[in-house]
């Protein structure tokens, strides 16, 4: 499994819908980039100026919303993930 460093998290991205609620099939270029996903791994936290570490707000298993163009796409063992900084996460879905 991937183990992110510092304030980074690994997200399993939720796929964009293939069709609308009304049943219209979307072309591949018409689908928005997904902005939701599940945290599958989290780093140790932020290192502050005094050397202490502040824990991350998100944890493994959280469903999150993130900035549309945030992070870096990563493939590991045939699975695609998104690696991003916690600051790029907008909200946790409860």
UniProtKB/Swiss-Prot annotation:
It is found in: Cytoplasm. Its main location: cytoplasm. It comes from the Bacteria. Pfam families: Cpn10. GO terms for molecular function: ATP binding; metal ion binding; protein folding chaperone; protein-folding chaperone binding; unfolded protein binding. Together with the chaperonin GroEL, plays an essential role in assisting protein folding. The GroEL-GroES system forms a nano-cage that allows encapsulation of the non-native substrate proteins and provides a physical environment optimized to promote and accelerate protein folding. GroES binds to the apical surface of the GroEL ring, thereby capping the opening of the GroEL channel. HAMAP family: CH10. This is Co-chaperonin GroES.
């Amino acid at each position: 499994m991937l183990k992110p460093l510092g304030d980074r998290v690994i997200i399993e991205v939720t796929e964009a819908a293939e069709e609308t609620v009304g049943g219209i099939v979307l072309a591949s270029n018409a689908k928005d980039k997904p902005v939701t996903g599940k945290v599958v791994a989290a780093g140790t936290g932020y290192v502050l100026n005094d050397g202490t570490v502040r824990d991350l707000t998100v944890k493994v298993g959280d469903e999150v919303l993130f900035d549309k163009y945030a992070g870096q796409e990563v493939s590991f063992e045939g699975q695609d993930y998104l690696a991003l900084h916690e600051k790029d996460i907008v909200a946790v879905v409860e």
